[in-house]
Each structure stands twice: as structure tokens, then as C-alpha cells.
A protein has these predicted regions:
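Polybasic, glycine- and aromatic-enriched phosphate-binding surface used to engage nucleic acids
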Residues: 3-192, 196-204
Length: 207
């Protein structure tokens, strides 16, 4: 049968319709190793990996993490950085054991000190507006939508592999900006979201 996403008339917009772009995180750590720092200090900006995102939200910096938390801001790294803002991110890889393929999170700049720029590591996909952040409610609404069971089921049917690439996310259809914003505003009024809450709220969307 068809997944709820395909059946819902509320989910029929391309990212181009929404004027949102999705890209692979441009910071490939082994190529920029000399610019990476374990912890933030003067002259660095946050470097975000999938490990910084958990069900409870974004945690940065991560103490004792195996990965660096920061990248030196310089002429050599500037072109790989994005300006401070709200972004929706999706992990590129999940393990076979994980319940979900599509795992989305939100970059909340309020949790990143006063960093003017941000680095996104290559194992994340990020949704942005012409290389800038999104309105907060839109970023949060995108994450809610991408974390629905319907999206995960649709993704599993169309893609046998455990990778989620930017091209896969470009091919999907989405709710309107208005509906995504509504989902985000709803999410901002809740505490911790459960799968049941997300799926129930998604079910209320109308075209």
C-alpha cells in the first residue's frame, strides 16, 4: 500500500516550491584537520557532528567526545561555514539496528554561545535558505515532518540503503511552508516530543 505521505494531499510541495535548499555538510574533517579544535576558544566557531544531536535536542560542546567541537575561523575555512541561524539537519547514516532511517534535528543558535558562523560536518545534511538559516518555526516544523513515521516508511520503501543523502531529501515532497511553520509553532509549545505526538499532529495537516 501507499504510505501516509503519498496519500496526504497536504504533502505535495517540492523543496524548490518552498524556496528551501538541502546540502551535505561541507566540512570534511580529515581534509581540514589542522583547523579543528577539541574545544571552542578564541577564533573558533562551533563544528556540528551527528553526535551533537540527540532525541533531547542539541548539546554543544560535548565534553569528552571523540570528535572536535570547533573549527578555526580563517580565510582557509570561511567558505565552508554557514552564518549563525536556525537550521534543520538530517543524519546521513543510521545503523542497521536503529529504528529510524530518517533522523532530523534542529540547530538552535541560542545553544551555541554567540558564534557568528557554524561548521556542519560531512555526516549531516542541512536544510537552509540560500546558505542562510531558516525562520525558527520553519526549521522546527521541517524536523517534525521528517521525524514522522510516514516519512520514514516512505524512505525505506524507496531506498534500500541506510544512507540518507541530500539528493534523497531533494526528491521527497513536503507540506507547504505554512503547514511546516504551523507544525513548528506547535512543537515550540510542547516539551519533549514523542513519536505518537509527532504522528498525531502530522495527521491533522490539511492541504
Amino acid at each position: 500500500g501507499k504510505s501516509a505521505c503519498e496519500l496526504s494531499p497536504a504533502v505535495r510541495h517540492s523543496l524548490a516550491d518552498l524556496d528551501i535548499q538541502v546540502s551535505t555538510g561541507p566540512v570534511v574533517d580529515f581534509r581540514l584537520r589542522e583547523h579543528l579544535r577539541d574545544l571552542p576558544k578564541d577564533g573558533t566557531v562551533p563544528l556540528l557532528y551527528p553526535g551533537h544531536f540527540a532525541a533531547s535536542g542539541l548539546t554543544w560542546p560535548l565534553a569528552g567526545a571523540k570528535k572536535p567541537n570547533a573549527i578555526q575561523r580563517s580565510g582557509a575555512t570561511e567558505k565552508w561555514l554557514y552564518p549563525r541561524g536556525f537550521y534543520c539537519v538530517v543524519r546521513r547514516f543510521s545503523s542497521k539496528e536503529e529504528r529510524r532511517r530518517v533522523v532530523a534535528g534542529v540547530v538552535d543558535p541560542g545553544l551555541l554561545a554567540d558564534a557568528p558562523m557554524l561548521g556542519f560536518e560531512n555526516h549531516l545534511n542541512l536544510f537552509h535558505a540560500h546558505r542562510h538559516g531558516l525562520p525558527e518555526a520553519l526549521a522546527r516544523g521541517l524536523a517534525v515532518f521528517l521525524n514522522t513515521t510516514a516519512v520514514d516508511e516512505q524512505f525505506r520503501r524507496f531506498s534500500g540503503h541506510t544512507q540518507v543523502n541530500a539528493t534523497d531529501l531533494k526528491r521527497m515532497t513536503y507540506p507547504s511552508r505554512e503547514n511546516l511553520t504551523r507544525l513548528g509553532q506547535w512543537a515550540m509549545q510542547q516539551g519533549q516530543l514523542t513519536q505518537a505526538m509527532i504522528d498525531a499532529q502530522f495527521g491533522t495537516l490539511t492541504a
